[in-house]
Design a protein with these regions (language model features):
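Short, hydrophobic alpha-helical membrane anchors of single-pass surface/secreted proteins
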Residues: 10-15
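Bacterial N-terminal signal peptides
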Residues: 16-27
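Residue-level "contact hotspot" at macromolecular interaction interfaces
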Residues: 778, 828, 857, 935-936
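Extracellular/periplasmic metallocenter environments
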Residues: 854
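Extracytoplasmic
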Residues: 860-864, 871-877, 881-1016
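Glycoside hydrolase catalytic-domain context in secreted enzymes
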Residues: 2-8, 27, 31-849, 862-866, ...
Length: 1016
């Protein structure tokens, strides 16, 4: 990427201490004030004698290594071991307070857990668009400003309570969004590694601050590595062949670490090629090789326990913890706030000789160095000790700017948008998301909320806005007793019971359709959502929420027209998720609503009556309006989240029907689609004139929407993911991580025509690209390809254009991407103006992983340079010749890792040993792996393979040429080796093999191959 994206023009954010601050008061409530909270270092050291400031580890003039060594020398063995836990022991005698890793800050300061009781504490802090929305700005400079605000607010909370609010932030998430069915799609940035790493680097730089040594906060990249599924996420293995691993998955992490925009990684729950990610040696071997800075690597919550429990990888926690430390993990997030089990397990590992004290000391030093860089042990708290401001005017303005910049205009037929406020009389703002803002699992509490209705009313005046949610209000009457189901009348709500004689508001419920049969019920009496509370059901929740969302239902119709209710909360596919044997609801003898039936036939039948027809209300409002804005979409706690993947991408049927009805009533209908992931909305694309997409964009959502709808801002967000026409365009399984082999994402998928391509987005103006120039048409490794293009705003309004540079390698030994993003720039162009945009790509970035030699290679080839407005909208093109290498024929006389195949079928990748190595494993008889273009010109006498075979009885290993069923040139029996990780050499005599050949190893079921080589 160009240096422009590296670092960093600041726009509009002065030092936050210059603004009026909302200072923290005891109890974490907010009060208006201008005072800056006391710095954390002063607070932590308050109980320490003054002479402690004279200790060497508190001397900022010493090197960090000297300070770490001095402090480690003063700690007891137990205190040192405790540094390997999320909540290490405080050391009052040295003035060291409670440290904690892990404050959530994905798109604003969000929440933390208490060291005292493990309880969750939520921050009231500036809330920005979800991460996928921040990336949709395609504006690293803006995202860096967001990171700056988040780190300022983290410092403010830390100053108020340093024991509770740590400065090691668990953000950003850089897992690539290769499949929109992933429940945590909203947390990531893009399906593209270049865009993801650029946005993550920008956010990370905002979080870390500008000091060359000290850190404002310490961001941690999540989740290393190959983590894209919630279903059984702690036992699923991400199968990553070398090219998918090195070219795709690692490239979301590596550039961020190299840019010093993160201080470590969090490991995923999953396994990587059969080995738990928490114990993968690449944490040390690979991740630490990307930087000369010390990294602090942490586990995800409770993941260390999985190695013994769900994964059954080790028999004891001592073995597991020893493996984690040796692999490069520094901190274990486990057993909530109690470090003692970790202390005991690590001490046990030391006693057994599974760990050396130097291993523990190294991990502990990583913890301490991070804290030194955060200024914790400096007498004055370091340069960021007095930074801290929350919800200032500047922060609010940035929240609005980022929410506006993230919006993507998907359709705009006939210039439907922008609406002219001078000629637009009344606007109907309808839909289930018209007058509410939803938070998500990794969002904090919004200081205030501007809904779409609020924003549009502020722009036009309240009298010019008619609004309704467009949802039905129903009653549910027990078909047997005739009594109505009702909740509590007060603001606190109350238990639901079928005891009401008449359908007053306590017996009326608004039904919100979220798709796939799932609904929520909101009480008309108090506006609270109905949920399960273990003793029954009550109308007492502000909105659906919680780790296992307990406010979800299915209303199932019986043949006689009555309905039954099925509880759909706690709907998770995690291995530890609870389940309910009796999910259907019954009315107990006392009238209370309870779980109690296994089947619909056993459930209580209710007569459902519609009190208010929501669609009819919306239609009536639309008929009287000059324009209708229908706000529909998803709810982050329902339509996929952590612990819950999606199966479909459709908009809820009830919401789509609402849009169609409003469109029929008012042709001037605009859809605002609010969602956290791509949706299959082909029907809307065909039926409405304008569609504007936004993520759940935080406290300023309504103002941002009004800015765009009325033309105060030109929409210039661009999609960071491909939007498919159908879920059928996606792979059969979410578990296929081989984007190269299975041709996933815009990079490789040339078989499907997307609804909206990667990089897509419309504008209120138009742009012409011209005069593409390439600085040098012939380049070599170490050079940089530099291009420039003129972009002219040919419309009548000023606007932003996101200029995108893609490349395509014309010739290669290996499959190459159809196109690949290399650089981009979001530029502002006034109406009639032409600007010259400069883009670049280092030639070394045109590399790919050579499986024949197990290393990076830049091939000799011509590369197409494609400049345009999206991955498919190419406006200018040129080419450049790269003077690189030519990959020679495979030399199989060298020891070859079996995983470095060109093609395979019926196999998976597994761990060679628990400590390191990757092997190919056959999952059926006749499985095969192919090694193409092997040089056998000197002949081959035998193939020697390192193999393992668990279970009883032998299996076969065959060597064939040309195809899996091609000419057989050798075979041998693979004996049972007694264990899947017990390898032995097997020699296969080879006959009549010469020339350049595609070599196939055909494997019997259960055979594992680590390495092999030919003898000649």
């Amino acid at each position: 990427m160009s240096t422009r994206h590296r670092r960093r023009t600041r726009r509009g954010i002065a030092a936050t201490t210059a603004f009026g601050v909302l200072a923290l008061t005891p109890g974490l409530a907010w009060a208006s004030a201008t005072a800056t909270p006391a710095d954390a270092a002063t607070t932590a050291a308050a109980a320490a004698p003054d002479h402690l400031d004279d200790l060497p580890f508190r001397d900022p003039d010493l090197s960090v290594d000297q300070r770490v060594d001095d402090l480690l020398g003063r700690l007891t063995r137990t205190e040192t071991i405790s540094l390997l836990h999320q909540f290490p022991l405080p050391v009052p005698r040295l003035g060291i307070g409670q440290f904690r890793s892990g404050t959530e800050a994905l798109h604003g300061l969000a929440w933390t857990t208490s060291h005292e009781d493990g309880a969750v504490h939520t921050a009231t802090a500036t809330t920005f668009p979800q991460a996928v929305g921040l990336a949709s700005t395609w504006d690293p400079e803006l995202v860096e400003q967001v990171g700056t605000v988040v780190s300022d607010e983290a410092r403010a909370y830390h100053a108020q309570d340093p024991d509770l609010w740590g400065l090691n932030l668990w953000a950003p998430v850089v897992n690539l969004l290769r499949d929109p069915r992933w429940g945590r799609n909203e947390e990531g940035y893009s399906e593209d590694p270049t865009l993801s790493s650029e946005i993550a680097t920008a956010y990370g730089h905002g979080l870390t601050g500008d000091d060359p040594f000290y850190l404002k906060t310490a961001p941690t990249l999540k989740h290393y590595l190959g983590y894209n599924t919630e279903t059984a996420r702690d036992t699923v293995s991400a199968v990553l062949p070398p090219r998918a691993l090195h070219e795709y998955e690692e490239q979301a992490f590596e550039p961020v670490i190299r840019a010093n925009a993160a201080t470590g990684v969090m490991t995923g729950y999953n396994l990587i090629n059969g080995r738990p990610a928490t114990a993968d040696p690449s944490l040390d071997d690979t991740v630490r090789s990307w930087t000369d800075r010390t990294l602090f690597n942490v586990s995800d919550a409770a993941a260390p326990l999985n190695l013994v429990a769900s994964q059954q990888y080790y028999d004891t926690q001592a073995e597991a913890d020893a493996a984690l430390v040796k692999a490069g993990l520094d901190s274990m997030t486990v057993n909530d706030n109690d470090p003692q089990p970790t202390i005991d397990a690590v001490q046990d590992a030391l006693d057994q000789g599974l760990l050396e004290w130097s291993d523990v000391r190294t991990a502990a030093s990583h913890n301490l160095e991070l804290r030194f860089r955060l200024g914790e042990f400096d007498p004055d708290g370091g340069p960021y000790g007095d930074v801290g401001a929350v919800d200032t005017a500047a922060h609010r303005a940035l929240a609005r700017e980022s929410a506006t910049a993230a919006q993507v205009l998907l359709k705009n037929d006939g210039g439907t948008l922008p609406l002219d406020p001078a000629t637009t009389g009344e606007v109907a703002v309808v839909g289930p998301l018209a007058d509410t803002l939803y938070t998500d699992w990794y969002g904090g509490k919004q200081p205030y909320s501007v809904t779409p209705v609020d924003g549009i009313a502020a722009r036009l005046g309240a009298d010019a806005v008619a609004t309704t949610e467009g949802v039905d209000r129903i009653t549910l009457r027990d078909a047997e007793t005739g009594r109505y189901l009702a909740g509590g009348a007060g603001s606190a709500g109350g238990p639901l019971a079928a005891t009401a004689d008449s359908p007053d508001t306590t017996a009326q419920f608004d039904v919100f359709d979220w798709g796939e049969g799932v609904v929520t019920l909101r009480s008309a009496a108090n506006g609270k959502t109905v949920g399960f509370n273990w003793s029954g059901f009550a109308n007492d929740q502000e909105q659906p929420n919680g780790w296992y969302v307990q406010q979800l239902f299915r209303i199932e119709e019986r043949p006689d027209g009555d309905v039954v209710l099925r509880y759909a909360g706690y709907d998770s596919a995690e291995s530890w998720s609870p389940s309910f044997a009796t999910p259907y609801l019954v009315v107990a003898d006392d009238g209370s609503l309870q779980l109690g039936a296994r089947t619909a036939d056993e459930a209580t039948a209710f007569t459902r009556d519609v009190v208010v027809d929501g669609t009819a209300q919306a239609v009536a409002a639309a008929e009287e309006a000059d324009a209708a804005v229908v706000v529909v979409g998803t709810m982050p706690f329902i339509n996929g989240r952590e612990a819950h993947d999606r199966t479909g991408l459709d908009l809820a049927a009830g919401q789509e029907a609402l849009v169609r009805a409003v469109r029929e009533a008012n042709p001037n209908t605009i859809v605002v689609l609010t969602s956290s992931y791509p949706q299959t909305i082909g029907g809307l694309q065909e039926s409405v004139p304008a569609i504007l997409w936004t993520t759940h964009a935080g406290q300023e959502t309504g103002n941002a929407l009004a800015d765009t709808l009325f033309g105060d801002a030109d929409p210039a967000g661009r999609l960071t993911q491909t939007w498919p026409r159908s879920v059928d365009d996606l792979p059969d399984t979410m578990l296929d991580y081989d984007v190269v082999g299975s041709r996933q994402t815009y990079l490789y998928d040339d078989a499907h025509d997307p609804l909206y391509p990667f990089g897509y987005g419309l504008s209120y103006t138009s742009f012409r690209y011209s005069h593409l120039r390439v600085a040098d048409r012939s380049v070599a490794p170490g050079d940089t390809v530099r291009v420039s293009v003129d972009v002219t705003n040919t419309g009548d309004v000023d606007g932003d254009e996101v200029v995108q540079l893609y490349t395509h390698q014309r010739t290669s030994r290996d499959d190459q991407p159809v196109r690949q993003l290399r650089d981009f720039d979001r530029v502002h162009v006034r109406a009639g103006q032409t600007v010259r945009v400069h883009l670049e790509v280092p030639v070394d970035a045109l590399r790919h992983w050579d499986v024949t030699r197990d290393r990076w290679v830049v091939e000799a080839s011509t590369h197409d340079l494609l400049v345009g407005a999206s991955s498919t909208d190419v406006r200018a093109r040129a080419s450049v010749r790269v003077d690189g290498e030519r990959i020679p024929a495979r030399d199989l006389t060298r020891v070859t890792q079996a995983q470095n195949y060109d093609d395979a079928d019926g196999t998976t990748l597994v761990d060679t040993t628990k400590e390191r190595g990757t092997s190919v494993a056959a999952t059926r008889d006749g499985a095969w792996v192919a090694y193409e273009d092997a040089d056998l010109t000197n002949g081959a006498r035998s193939l020697v393979a390192s193999v393992a075979k668990a279970g009883d009885g032998p299996a076969r290993l065959e060597v064939r040429l040309g195809a899996p069923d091609g000419r057989l040139v050798g075979s041998a029996e693979v004996p049972a080796t007694g264990d899947a990780r017990a390898y032995a050499d097997v020699t296969v005599p080879i006959r009549r093999a010469a020339g350049r050949q595609d070599v196939y190893l055909v494997l019997g079921d259960g055979v594992r191959v680590s390495t092999f080589h030919l003898t000649s």
